[in-house]
UniProtKB/Swiss-Prot annotation:
PANTHER family referenced in this protein's UniProt entry, alphabetically: 40S RIBOSOMAL PROTEIN S15A
UniProt-listed GO biological process terms: translation
Lineage: Bacteria, Bacillati, Chloroflexota, Chloroflexia, Chloroflexales
Gene of this entry: rpsH
Subunit structure: Part of the 30S ribosomal subunit. Contacts proteins S5 and S12.
Gene source species: Roseiflexus castenholzii (strain DSM 13941 / HLO8)
Protein name: Small ribosomal subunit protein uS8
Listed Pfam families: Ribosomal_S8 (PF00410)
UniProt-listed SUPFAM superfamilies: Ribosomal protein S8
InterPro entries: Ribosomal_uS8, Ribosomal_uS8_sf
Keywords: Ribonucleoprotein, Ribosomal protein, RNA-binding, rRNA-binding
Keyword rRNA-binding: yes
Length: 132
């Protein structure tokens, strides 16, 4: 089955795995998805991720993070810019998610980065998703 929006598919797989309390989730690999996984790990939303090389395609295996009482650290994921409606933002308008408790992920001319990193580097870009 072909996927029209691979990033939305990644976010949906993570959301479903969190709701089902799975330890890991497998996602078909791409450079953009790897960059998003690196940001999620750096910001503390996931425990770890590995890339498994495969014959038809490689996959990213994400180890999800839970609190001591087995509640998922990721409580919400939202795709913002979609293939049918791209959303771009200037540096001054980079959104704060949940009053600073969440994270916005942007695709900028300097690569994929978190919203606060883009603000520090004084660049805007396409708002890929929100995580909280």
């Amino acid at each position: 089955m072909s996927v029209n929006d691979p990033i939305a598919d990644m976010l949906t797989r993570i959301r479903n795995a969190c709701m089902a309390r799975h330890a890991t989730v497998s996602i078909p690999s791409s450079k953009m998805k790897l960059a998003i996984a690196q940001i999620l790990k750096r910001e503390g939303f996931i425990q770890d991720f590995t890339v498994q090389e495969g014959k038809p395609y490689s996959t990213i295996v994400i180890t999800l993070k839970y609190t001591p009482d087995r509640r998922p650290v990721i409580t919400g994921l939202k795709r913002v810019s979609k293939p049918g409606l791209r959303i771009y933002t200037k540096r001054a308008d980079i959104p704060r998610v949940r009053g600073g408790l969440g994270l916005s992920i942007l695709s900028t001319p300097r690569g994929v980065m978190a919203g606060h990193e883009a603000w520090q580097q004084r660049v805007g870009g396409e708002v890929l998703c929100y995580v909280w």
